[in-house]
């Protein structure tokens, strides 16, 4: 099952074609077999535009499906969530790196998950909260499907937004490393 949210809305609306070389196209993957997710953002002239947020399915025929997902845009940067050494999902990372090595000028970067500290459940909850806050900011909250399992798309979106904000040297509180036991989101 593949669901997708695409939008031409941004903080500052700008017309854009698929091959606009003055912009940067950032793709972030939350890796997994049953619930991988992809976010594609365009960064141009200090504005960010959400091009696509998709929940993907790589459970069968994963090589063809990943190749299809990678061929939809001309990315300048591809972000992959770092996996533990013996994870069964490491094969996806190597496949993506190999696929883009000769076919694209995109940089492929493995990054740590955005949320850290506390329990797995707490990290996922904070990730979804930050994602929904960003969807409100972009005016896309109505496009987000009502479902319980939003943490995969939230993680991919937060990977992409953290990358953009780091490039702009912008601090966003939910993305800060939190060592406190009782993290309370204050915005």
Curated annotation (Swiss-Prot):
GO molecular function: four-way junction DNA binding; magnesium ion binding; nuclease activity
UniProt xrefs under InterPro entries: HJ-resolvase_A22 (IPR006932), RNaseH-like_sf (IPR012337)
EC number: 3.1.-.-
Cofactor note: Binds 1 Mg(2+) ion per subunit.
Pfam families: Pox_A22 (PF04848)
Gene Ontology BP, a term: DNA recombination
Cofactor: Mg(2+)
Region forming the signal peptide: none
Keywords associated with the record: DNA damage, DNA recombination, DNA repair, Hydrolase, Magnesium, Nuclease, Phosphoprotein
Family assignment from sequence similarity: Belongs to the RuvC family. Poxviruses-type subfamily.
Task performed by this protein: Plays a role in DNA replication by cleaving viral DNA concatamers to yield unit-length viral genomes. The concatamer junctions contain inverted repeat sequences that can be extruded as cruciforms, yielding Holliday junctions that A22 protein cleaves.
Protein name (Swiss-Prot/TrEMBL): Resolvase OPG149
């Amino acid at each position: 099952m593949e669901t997708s949210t695409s939008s031409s809305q941004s903080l500052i609306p700008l017309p854009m074609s698929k091959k606009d070389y003055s912009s940067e196209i950032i793709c972030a993957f939350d890796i997994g077999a049953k619930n991988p997710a992809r976010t594609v953002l365009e960064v141009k002239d200090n504005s960010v535009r959400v091009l696509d947020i998709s929940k993907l399915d790589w459970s069968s025929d994963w090589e063809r499906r990943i190749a299809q997902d990678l061929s939809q845009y001309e990315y300048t940067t591809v972000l992959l969530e770092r996996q533990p050494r013996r994870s069964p999902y490491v094969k996806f990372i190597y496949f993506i790196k190999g696929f883009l090595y000769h076919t694209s000028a995109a940089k492929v970067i493995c990054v740590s998950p955005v949320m850290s500290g506390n329990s797995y459940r707490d990290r996922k909850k904070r990730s979804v909260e930050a994602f929904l806050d960003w969807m409100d900011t972009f005016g896309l909250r109505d496009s987000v499907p009502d479902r319980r399992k939003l943490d995969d798309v939230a993680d991919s979106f937060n990977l992409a937004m953290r990358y953009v904000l780091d490039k702009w040297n912008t601090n966003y509180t939910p993305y800060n490393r939190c060592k406190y036991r009782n993290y309370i989101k204050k915005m």
